[in-house]
């Protein structure tokens, strides 16, 4: 099984929006990632439009279809439409991405930092998952590795989960990754047993990706943005994407 790399281009939009105008060009950055071999492009449009905007979503949808790579839209399915943000379901209706990842983040969060609460939100999620699937989208739910109810994602109709890897990255940074890897491996096995595909993302980097993939079975896709864009400032965007692909292929070790 080959793990796919989906590059999250949110941070390109952060840099653009910090100055206004169109530079750096999010579509051109995504095109470079695809040219380097990325299997897909991920975006997480937020209602406050702090980075990716609706017009970026439409343009990136066209680009990914043109190049035959996956488009993954992340977002909070409960966030209502507002000026400049038509809502996650409407964005997916307009662009029909191959995958939508449902993330329970609030408007004020700096970044996604927790997974779905099945007890609280399961009843609301089921009809939304069905609605996304009628659009032809594969549906993935953002989950915490320690959640005992991961199998509930399958019962709600989801196709995959995305394991929130922030805690693993923190543990790896402090040289304490083994207990975290055991937790994530158990989560992956439980998901697989329930018939779910396994994605992973958040704070994965060249420093920790190889160890994660070696320790966690059956990972179909990793979504990486913040670290990849940061590393690209030193290494260049296309070489950085190729470095990640080499790690995924087992052709490179973790970075020093």
UniProtKB/Swiss-Prot annotation:
GO biological process terms, semicolon-separated: pyridoxine biosynthetic process
GO molecular-function terms, A-Z: pyridoxine 5'-phosphate synthase activity
A single Gene Ontology CC term: cytosol
Residues where 3-amino-2-oxopropyl phosphate binds: 8, 19, 203, 225-226
Keywords from the named record: Cytoplasm, Pyridoxine biosynthesis, Transferase
Listed pathway(s): Cofactor biosynthesis; pyridoxine 5'-phosphate biosynthesis; pyridoxine 5'-phosphate from D-erythrose 4-phosphate: step 5/5
Compartment list: Cytoplasm
Positions annotated as active site in the UniProt record: 44, 74, 202
NCBIfam families: pdxJ, PRK05265.1-4
Name of the featured protein: Pyridoxine 5'-phosphate synthase
């Amino acid at each position: 099984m080959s793990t796919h790399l989906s590059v999250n281009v949110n941070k390109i939009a952060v840099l653009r929006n910090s100055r206004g105008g169109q530079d750096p060009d999010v579509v051109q950055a995504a095109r470079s990632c695809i040219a380097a071999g990325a299997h897909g492009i991920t975006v997480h449009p937020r209602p406050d439009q702090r980075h990716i905007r609706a017009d970026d979503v439409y343009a990136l949808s066209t680009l990914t279809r043109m190049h035959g790579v996956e488009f993954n839209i992340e977002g909070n399915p409960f966030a209502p439409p507002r000026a400049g943000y038509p809502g996650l379901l409407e964005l997916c209706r307009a662009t029909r991405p191959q995958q939508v990842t449902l993330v329970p983040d609030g408007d004020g969060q700096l970044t996604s930092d927790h997974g779905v609460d099945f007890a609280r939100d399961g009843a609301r999620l089921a009809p939304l998952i069905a609605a996304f699937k009628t659009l032809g989208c594969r549906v993935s739910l953002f989950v915490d590795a320690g959640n005992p109810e991961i199998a509930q994602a399958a019962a709600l109709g989801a196709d995959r989960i995305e394991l929130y890897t922030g805690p693993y990255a923190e543990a790896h940074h402090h040289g304490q990754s083994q207990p975290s890897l055991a937790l994530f491996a158990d989560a992956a096995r439980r998901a697989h047993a329930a018939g779910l595909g396994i994605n992973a993302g958040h704070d994965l980097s060249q420093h920790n990706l190889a160890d994660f993939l070696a320790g966690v079975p059956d990972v179909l896709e990793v979504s990486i943005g913040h670290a990849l864009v940061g590393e690209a400032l030193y290494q260049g965007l296309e070489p950085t994407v190729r470095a990640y692909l080499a790690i995924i292929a087992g052709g490179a070790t973790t970075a020093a």
